[in-house]
From Swiss-Prot:
Region (Disordered): 1-33
Record-annotated CP-type G domain positions: 104-273
Pfam families referenced in this protein's UniProt entry, alphabetically: RsgA_GTPase
Classification via CDD domains: YjeQ_EngC (cd01854)
Organism: Escherichia fergusonii (strain ATCC 35469 / DSM 13698 / CCUG 18766 / IAM 14443 / JCM 21226 / LMG 7866 / NBRC 102419 / NCTC 12128 / CDC 0568-73)
Binding site for GTP: N160, K161, I162, D163, G214, Q215, S216, G217, V218, G219, K220, S221, S222
Cofactor note: Binds 1 zinc ion per subunit.
Keyword entries, A-Z: Cytoplasm, GTP-binding, Hydrolase, Metal-binding, Nucleotide-binding, Ribosome biogenesis, RNA-binding, rRNA-binding, Zinc
Cofactors: Zn(2+)
Gene Ontology CC entries for this record: cytoplasm
UniProt name for this protein: Small ribosomal subunit biogenesis GTPase RsgA
GO biological process, one term: ribosomal small subunit biogenesis
Protein's gene: rsgA
Main location: cytoplasm
Binding site for Zn(2+): C297, C302, H304, C310
Length: 350
């Protein structure tokens, strides 16, 4: 999904070079090999510029340079690295990342200027955090779910701040969340303030690498602090009592370990997933309850709106597909078209 797609032959050569490094780590170096120790396995816990922090098997963190032959390196990558030795002047030499293991998954986001950019690697699940304050937005949840389905990374929906609900409000929110439970998504109701519901969430995170996604103000950082036992400093986006707006903060993507087991990558790049780079067919596939009806419409070019003989529209009318989800599907398509129009207009100005 890179901006300049490699040919099959080029990709084979890149993969072959990486495999040689993984096996031997003895190709011609861009650093003096005498400065480094034996190759070891590690995981990237943060990346900045041409340096990365790599955690070794014993839990120590090492600042490393990155070989120029490595095309892409992000937080969560599993790597072969070598520790730096003590230089003659008594100065410790940084370690070096020699090669990157094949990724099981990669989280990406679109960028107007750089194409699709990787954010994190080897993610097992995306935790979609929403809240009743400043507003429970099913449209935002649906956007995240489309991104998860497109990336083929399992989502979990977490509704935070349930301590602010009375019985009537809880019943309404549960009715809204049943829309997602009924199509196979896992939904957890929690409060980072009272810590209600944290135990099931801890169990869902154990033994997996997760990334939390959510708009400013939903309590994502407060929730992470509660799960981490306040052992780490993750900036909190508090909600103003007057405006209801979250305070914007930015940090580098970093991997943390939960005390109960499992890891989380905290990244500012997943506040909101852009979908404008996707094709309409990918958005349609991102709504899992549509799958049984695709190909059953009267016309092959059906837009799944007011077209006669639309199987998806009929399923909505019969109550088999939630009308809210159907409406959000079209809102997403409309927003994509608007963004692409603005992008094309901007491109013509350059």
């Amino acid at each position: 999904m890179s901006k300049n797609k490699l040919s099959k032959g080029q990709q084979r050569r890149v993969n072959a070079n990486h495999q040689r490094r993984l096996k031997t780590s003895k190709e011609k170096p861009d650093y003096d090999d005498n400065l480094f120790g034996e190759p070891d396995e590690g995981i990237v816990i943060s990346r900045f510029g041409m340096h990365a922090d790599v955690e070794s098997a014993d839990g120590d963190v090492h600042r490393c340079n990155i070989r120029r032959t490595i095309r892409s390196l992000v937080t969560g990558d599993r790597v072969v690295w070598r520790p730096g030795k003590l230089a003659a002047e008594g100065v410790n030499v940084k370690g070096i990342v020699e090669a990157v293991h094949e990724r099981t998954s990669v989280l990406t986001r679109p960028d107007f200027y750089d194409g699709v950019k990787p954010i994190a690697a080897n993610i097992d699940q995306i935790v979609i955090v929403s809240a009743i304050l400043p507003e429970l937005s099913l449209n935002i949840i649906d956007r995240y779910l489309v991104a998860c389905e497109t990336l083929q990374i399992e989502p979990i929906i977490v509704l935070n701040k349930i301590d602010l609900l009375d019985d009537e409000g809880m019943a309404f929110v549960n009715e809204q969340m049943d829309i997602y439970r009924n199509i196979g998504y896992r939904v957890l109701m929690v409060s980072s303030h009272t810590q209600d519901g944290l135990k099931p969430l801890e169990e869902a995170l154990t033994g997996r690498i997760s990334i939390f996604a959510g708009q400013s103000g939903v309590g994502k950082s407060s929730l992470l602090n509660a799960l981490l036992g306040l052992q780490k400093e993750i900036l909190t986006n508090d909600v103003s009592d007057n405006s209801g707006l979250g305070q914007h903060t930015t940090t580098a993507a970093r991997l943390y370990h939960f005390p109960h087991g499992g890891d989380v990558i905290d990244s500012p790049g997943v506040r909101e997933f852009g979908l404008w780079h996707l094709e309409p067919e990918q958005i349609t596939q991102g709504f899992v309850e549509f799958h049984d009806y695709l190909g059953l419409c009267k016309y092959r070019d059906c837009k799944h709106d007011t077209d006669p003989g639309c199987a998806i529209r009929e399923a909505v009318d019969e109550g088999k597909i939630a009308e809210t989800r159907f409406e959000n599907y079209h809102r997403i398509l409309e927003s994509m078209a608007q963004v692409k129009t603005r992008k094309n207009f901007s491109d013509t100005d350059d």
